[in-house]
Curated annotation (Swiss-Prot):
Example of a GO biological process term: 'de novo' UMP biosynthetic process
Gene3D superfamilies registered for this protein in UniProt: Aldolase class I (3.20.20.70)
Keyword Flavoprotein among UniProt keywords: yes
Described function: Catalyzes the conversion of dihydroorotate to orotate with fumarate as the electron acceptor.
Binding site for substrate: 46, 70-74, 130, 195-196
Pathway participation: Pyrimidine metabolism; UMP biosynthesis via de novo pathway
Catalytic activity, as annotated: (S)-dihydroorotate + fumarate = orotate + succinate
Self-association state and partner proteins as the record states: Homodimer.
Name the UniProt record assigns to this protein: Dihydroorotate dehydrogenase A (fumarate)
Localization: Cytoplasm
Phylogenetic lineage: Bacteria, Bacillati, Bacillota, Bacilli, Lactobacillales
Keywords: Cytoplasm, Flavoprotein, FMN, Oxidoreductase, Pyrimidine biosynthesis
Amino acid sequence: MINTHITLPGLDLKNPVMPASGTFGFGDVPAAKKFDLNDLGAMVIKTTTPKATSGNPQPQIAVLDDGVLNSVGLTNPGVDQVISEKLVPLRKQYPNLPIMASVGGDSESDYVEVAKKLSDSDLVNALEINVSCPNVAQGGMSFGVHPDVVEELTKKIKDVVDVPIYVKLTPNVTDIVAIAQAAEKGGADGISMINTVLGMDIDVQTRRPVLGHNVGGLSGEAVKPIAIRMISQVYQNVTLPIIGMGGISSAEDVIKFMLAGASAVAVGTAHFNDSIASKHIADSLPAELEKLGIDDINDLVGQVKFN
């Protein structure tokens, strides 16, 4: 019997596969009704903010040859409604499923408020801190690009929550290791990486960017080598477990990410082509491991053999 069980802070996973935040809503998208979410390792919900947000101007999504460019924004009904209208029914339907909530905001106080409310709800097992949000107090620069800001934000959140926190790193930085180390220093229990890579595409007929917001986050196949490289770098320089993401679309990809240093993975853009990709990947993982002669998936973590 092949072991796919993974134990992470706050998350007891039957397998390492979960949907990436924003790609499965609050467990209420049509695809989530096509299978039992207990078939996944965990459920990660859409980023939640203090008040309701409506997202960015249309068009918000552009499908490219090798990925997806999106500027959806953090559309959500606000933390109080997320708890009462989304998390309560999700937890009622899935009492034993590990649930990770994603936290966002425009200020440190926003993050602290949302994190505390979600932690106090007793409905989630862990929090993912989305530090790619623009920091209004710093002129709109992402929270996640300054190590000192990440460290301070992590500390403030840790002070008010009772569940483990995973800091989600943006790849749009010069030195991602410094950001990961800052999260570790601030008391993070884990790292989640990578978020989308900033990009833009242009319609040559109109000469306008294809997204209403002009720029957006690139995800999918195109970012996979970037994600693998960054995960490997961070794994070698911090002691925290890593949830890896960035272009995963197969069980073989899961193995690649784990060899680079991820202990678990999140599937996002693959759901555009296959609405239940995360389930299909989780289901096919044991056979892929057997093909490679691997009895315990935990033995893969960080075991890439460098040339």
